[in-house]
Amino acid sequence: MRRVVVTGIGLITPIGIGKEEFWKNNKEGKSGICDMPELEKFGFESKAYGYVKNFKPEQLGLTLREIRRMDRITQFGVLCTDQAVKDSKIDLSKIDKNRVGVNIANAVAGTKFMDEEFSVLTNNGKEVVNPEDISPYAYARSMPNTTSNEVSYRYDFNGTCCTMATGCTTGIDSIGFAYDQIRCGELDVMICGAAEAPITPITIAAFEAIGTLSTNNNPPEKASRPFDDTRNGFVLAEAAGILVLEELGHALNRGAHIYGEIAGYGSVNNAMHMTGLKPDGEDLSRAIKIAIEEANVTPFEIDYINAHGSGTKQNDINETGAYKKVFGELAYKIPMSSTKSMTGHPLGAASAVEAIVCCLALENNFMPPTINYNKKDALCDLDYIPNCGREKNLNVVLTNASGFGGLHAAMILKKYID
């Protein structure tokens, strides 16, 4: 099997646009959570959101025509890809574009456009839809695979073009799919990761209906509290995280900078319940074990874990239980943290952003903190790197995710060693 490495990254998040701003704020434990006065009229109990401020697509490289054509999620994905391709320093004139694929994932696709379009077309639900008034972009802007398509068009990448849609594990699953495509020799380069822009009334209402959103609104910066005893839900957010994956020889031949190596990937389903989780973490533990075995490492070699850490009561207990099943007493000695304490939960994009955190952690030998951790939960009693990040020599790191529908995924990344 061929080896697969990360050579480019792009980030659009509530704590920064671009890797430099993002990593600085991630290291320092800055919260990107805010209130959104324009949503007050809907009367939602949750009033804290991970909104990407100062996002100006026209200044980042999109034309006005492209902005009109693309939903916010696609703008995120395309511009984040621009960052990642530029960061990779890949010479597009010297590669075989038939050997380059795209898989940019999402959980809920173009809800912003559809929400706004429905309101306009029906006078806020008071009138029937007149087909003659519908935008010619309506279907394309709402398709789950539009972002992957737009990136393929933009760069003339002619390999696989597809979209994972596995909820909150979809970022890792997209990277895992890309890893498998390259490892097995189908492609040499993959653009992968995820984008999400779900802060819309319909999406917020859907999550409120099942009681998953945090109501710790005052102040909003402290609403996301993974593993803390006072947590009561996740903070809905938007973001994009895009990676350029390459076959190792392809990367070395062009002298690419290597952030890290994708070494193992595991994905399972508990086949039990749409939102329910077993508190012992048995199902997530299986995904972690698969990733560790595929990476050919031992549990003792894991230096850091970037946790799913959504901030819901049951998820954080389930995740803690999974670590204890996999690592036993060693679980108490492995530092771990939740990026969502700062960014909120951008659904499908979360685990893509968190895989990039692992790359930057490996490169900088630094583990970011879990902020807003002030009161210990007796059932969540591991080392969550509370409130202040730490330096540590990192060689092997783990990231994982869980999602509605009983999905669990895990990935091992290694520092590249020749």
Question: Where on the chain are the PLM-derived regions?
Answer:
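Active-site-proximal alpha-helical scaffold in enzymes
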Residues: 77-90, 144-148, 152-155, 161-196, ...
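Acyl-CoA/ACP chain-elongation machinery
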Residues: 186-232, 265-279, 309-316, 333-383
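Condensing-enzyme catalytic core mediating Claisen C-C bond formation in acyl metabolism
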Residues: 3-7, 30-35, 218-295, 304, ...
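A glycine- and small-aliphatic-rich helix-loop capping segment at beta-alpha/alpha-beta transitions
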Residues: 20-24, 111-128, 181-184, 204-217, ...
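Conserved beta-ketoacyl condensing-enzyme motif
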Residues: 6, 21-23, 27-165, 195-204, ...
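Glycine-/small-residue-rich "gating" segment that lines the acyl/pantetheine channel
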Residues: 125-135, 176, 180, 196-253, ...
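Beta-strand segments within the central parallel beta-sheet cores of soluble alpha/beta enzyme folds
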Residues: 5, 95-104, 162-166, 187-195, ...
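Short pre-catalytic strand/loop immediately N-terminal to key active-site residues, enriched for Gly-Thr
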Residues: 134-139, 159-166, 228-232, 334-345, ...
